[in-house]
A protein has these predicted regions:
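Conserved phosphate-binding elements of NTP-dependent enzyme cores
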Residues: 1-357
Length: 357
């Protein structure tokens, strides 16, 4: 209501300029009409247009695979285009941050993806009871044998095959869904065992670990903060990747890049071009604001961002807009507008312009 009634101030766009750009020439995949498109670097570029106007063809089918091949000398063939030029040396890596699951196994979760679980396992293995019993960090892993429940292999549930229906997941009777052997669950840090910790929300975990004097605990709290920054304070540390929505998986990937240690790459700075496809899907106004602030943090590190998006708040926050259309299908595939959000307002040919007014 605060947003709808205008009582809460929306995100205020930062003004950014750029000195470098790349140019995609002769894009002709699907309905694209042999177009030349310039993408500025070091800023937020938003690609807009009605559904079917050619946005995904331009960014996902041509630009991303073409850049990936240029940088890595391998990869799938891009869609039809004539050339890629400009400040290509200003990009060391290209990342397509999609909504696919964060791990191949259902045991994958946010803390394993962000590598925070290594510190949690170390913290527990350093406790007196663990040392007395010879428990190492590997005993607190649910990916290998040792401390995990042998019945469910660290899943917390078992799948029951149904002959004529989809398999049914049942809580493991052996561990009661706690994933680990009883002796491992006896190890406690400040009264909490591994199951208790994995059932904390991100917000609860930051409060718990951040209040401790132990430097490892404080590091855990710090490394969890990016999940809050992308609007995921509510998810459980041990929540299976199979239960996360596509949008949540995408934001965990964003949190991973926000958590990357800059000091490790000072000798050879990383300049990553991030590509997002409709990252605001399912987000509340407040979460969109957090997403934009996360984009700001990536840009402040010297990276570049291209977003395919319909959300008006994201479009208004752009430094550069590329509007495709004017219609969908055969009537689309042209660059209707390329410029700043303020200049877009004067473009009568753009449906996006009319939508934002």
């Amino acid at each position: 209501m605060q947003y709808l009634g205008g009582d809460r101030q929306r995100y205020v766009r930062k003004t950014r300029s750029w000195n470098y750009s790349i140019k995609l020439e002769g894009a002709m995949e699907h309905n694209l009409k042999d177009i030349d498109v310039t993408f500025p670097l070091g800023v937020l570029t938003v690609v807009t247009g009605v559904s079917g106007s050619g946005k995904s063809s331009l960014v996902g089918d041509i630009l991303y695979p073409a850049l990936y091949r240029h940088i890595n000398q391998t990869g799938s063939a891009p869609g039809t285009f004539r050339g890629l030029s400009g400040s290509l040396d200003r990009i060391t890596q290209v990342e397509y941050v999609d909504q696919n699951p964060i791990g191949k196994s259902s045991r994958s979760n946010a803390v394993t993806y962000l590598k925070v679980y290594d510190d949690i396992r170390k913290l527990l293995s350093d406790q007196q009871y663990a040392r007395m019993n010879g428990f190492t960090p590997s005993h607190f892993s649910f990916n290998i044998d040792g401390g995990r429940c042998p019945e469910c292999q660290g899943e917390g549930f078992v799948k029951i095959g149904m002959q004529f229906m989809a398999d049914v997941s049942m809580v493991c009777e052996s561990c009661g869904g706690m994933r680990f052997k009883p002796e491992i669950l006896e190890v406690r840090y400040k009264g909490m065992n591994i199951d208790d910790i994995l059932n904390l929300s991100v917000e609860e975990a930051i409060s718990f670990f951040g209040s401790q004097d132990d430097p490892v605990a404080k590091r855990i709290a710090e490394r969890l903060q990016p999940l809050v920054d992308v609007g995921l304070s509510y998810i459980k540390l041990g929540q299976s990747s199979s239960t996360l929505s596509g949008g949540e998986s995408q934001r965990i990937k964003l949190a991973y890049f926000l958590s990357m240690n800059d000091s490790a790459s000072k000798s050879k700075p990383q300049r990553i071009l991030f590509i997002f496809d409709e990252p605001t899907t399912g987000l509340h106004f407040y979460d969109v604001e957090k997403l934009l602030k996360s984009f700001d943090a990536l840009l402040a590190k010297g990276h570049s961002i291209i977003v395919v998006e319909h959300n008006p708040d994201v479009i208004r926050a752009a430094d550069w807009i590329i509007d495709l259309g004017p219609e969908a299908g055969d009537e689309g595939g042209n660059v209707v507008f390329a410029g700043t959000p303020s200049d877009l307002m004067a473009c009568d040919a753009s449906y996006t312009s009319r939508y934002l007014r």
